[in-house]
Amino acid sequence: MWRVCARRAQNAAPRAGFGARWTAFREEPGAPCVTPQAGSALARCSSKTPGYGRVRALCGWSPVSRATPRNRVLLQLWGSPSRRWYSLPPHQKVPLPSLSPTMQAGTIARWEKKEGEKINEGELIAEVETDKATVGFESVEECYMAKILVAEGTRDVPVGAIICITVDKPEDVEAFKNYTLDSSAAPAPPAAPAPTPAAPAPSPTPSAQAPGSSYPTHMQVLLPALSPTMTMGTVQRWEKKVGEKLNEGDLLAEIETDKATIGFEVQEEGYLAKILIPEGTRDVPLGTPLCIIVEKEADIPAFADYRPAEVTDLKPPAPPPIPSPAAPVPPAPQPVAPPPSAPRPAAPAGPKGRVFVSPLAKKLAAEKGIDLTQVKGTGPDGRIIKKDIDSFVPTKAAPTPAAAVPPPSPGVAPVPTGVFTDIPISNIRRVIAQRLMQSKQTIPHYYLSIDVNMGEVLLVRKELNKMLEGKSKISVNDFIIKASALACLKVPEANSSWMDTVIRQNHVVDISVAVSTPAGLITPIVFNAHIKGLETIANDVVSLATKAREGKLQPHEFQGGTFTISNLGMFGIKNFSAIINPPQACILAIGASEDRLVPADNEKGFDVASMMSVTLSCDHRVVDGAVGAQWLAEFRKYLEKPITMLL
């Protein structure tokens, strides 16, 4: 967890900072707030004018500081055009500071001080979750917490919003017991007491957040951004159970992001008191409370019924069985009975084949085209009533009475088994689909193919693996990665990226290796492949591929890369064309090696060689055709004469 002093936050963003005397809105008793007219108020300000210090601080602001516009802040400080007097003791309105350069809103993760407590200089006031991390918010002056205006767990609090009130004297705390920000900021004071009976109306909102104040000291663990493009995630699995002790660094849960499944670690010690999001819950927005952690094991039972408002709309994935048809279609042990209702086969029909049905049910059946002989009645004496029509699900094999015999197989009427299966789209699969579509629609692909004689590589590989016996083995793919990296150094245009306004030519070669996983395709990266040896590359590839298949890759291990390799040769594919991984400019598709007859200077005039076909997909905006051909020539040279990789 990061901790930042408000003084540093103040320097980074002049518009906010707790304890900064010119940024906390200090209101003196009896001091009128007058809106300056066309800047005239600034001209009339003197050192004796109430709020002069605040105005003087504002005078030093400029648009370059990226602070809040001057007229907007003046309006916040001075209030409405009408005069108003405050009967409250001197106090400071503490705004939410900007704790990161890109922060626009924050979440109050936890209040470290309670109302009435003394706050010493340097003490932690609250923990605020920004767009980057959870940051400790410290005081830079001594004061007392008079009123907390934003409850724990409140999300998307705008930067600059008033979050609490502090006073200089402990005897002034009581005056703010019933203080609300709306009542103090209202333009017309007499109108404020009138709607006070309506104050219970907003009470449901605090009641949803009330757990933060009425429960023992605890911390809400919110869903963080585990990748730069992540907007929501899926809770794949909880690694800890309620009541278990958590140590710093322990794996708490596995979260499926838009890139991969990533382990979510605990940042501090405690006990897991409540799991708020069950396993399998999909599309959980960032910042949603996932669980509750307490410091003391004795506090765990207090959170048995804890349920914040943020998670009420989140539901785990619905089970595949359809609830309504399951009741009227029980499994029939007697296949002789035509209708699915085996318990009372003769109930719907009378002595002469008459069907007992209520007038309303008969009308509804006619409108819906339902054959009443197939409906089981649940009314008196087996009479069909409206409820039976509403809950009836016709079977597919119901055109004739004879065809009604097959349905007793399973109780799933709407979707016959064996026709198709709907597989939910994971976040990873959705992102893969979006990026592939974007690549094909926006990148002008062209393709170059070449055959490579792999005879020398196979001989060198055999010798090296003998030397490494008992250690890791070098594969043909490792030679391909090394040759690709060296070819990128020779032809740097292929190791470039299209950045809309510029073409970025990379000076290091990070090879992305396509790996197929149960969740979808992912491309872990062999960093600095151009300076690594074959053994190091082999170890990296094995480690990354294992992590990818187990869903344990960290974001930095698969985000980035300057050149991609996709190898389908192990499946017997001779050649194929791969889709470029933006913003990269090239991807190399590797086919299988096969023995071919090639011309040779010997008595027979030919020889048998192991030939491999490769296809280079290029972005024509970055790599021209001749440049792509030059890269393939360098690549083939390194593989057909692997000793040149040492140069």
From Swiss-Prot:
It is an enzyme of class 2 (transferase). The modification N6-lipoyllysine is found at residues 132, 259. Its main location: mitochondrion. Keywords: Acetylation, Acyltransferase, Carbohydrate metabolism, Glucose metabolism, Lipoyl, Mitochondrion, Phosphoprotein, Repeat, Transferase, Transit peptide, Tricarboxylic acid cycle. Its EC number is 2.3.1.12. The active site is at residues 620, 624. Delipoylated at Lys-132 and Lys-259 by SIRT4, delipoylation decreases the PHD complex activity. Residues 184-216, 311-352 are annotated as: Disordered. It comes from the Eukaryota. Part of the pyruvate dehydrogenase complex (PDHc) that is a multi-enzyme complex composed of multiple copies of three enzymes, pyruvate dehydrogenase (subunits PDH1A and PDHB, E1 component), dihydrolipoamide acetyltransferase (DLAT, E2 component), and dihydrolipoamide dehydrogenase (DLD, E3 component) to which is added an additional protein the E3-binding protein (PDHX, E3BP). In terms of structural architecture, the E2 and E3BP components assemble into a 60meric central core with icosahedral symmetry. The central core is decorated with E1 and E3 proteins. This is Dihydrolipoyllysine-residue acetyltransferase component of pyruvate dehydrogenase complex. It comes from Bos taurus (Bovine). The lineage of its organism: Eukaryota, Metazoa, Chordata, Craniata, Vertebrata. The gene is DLAT.
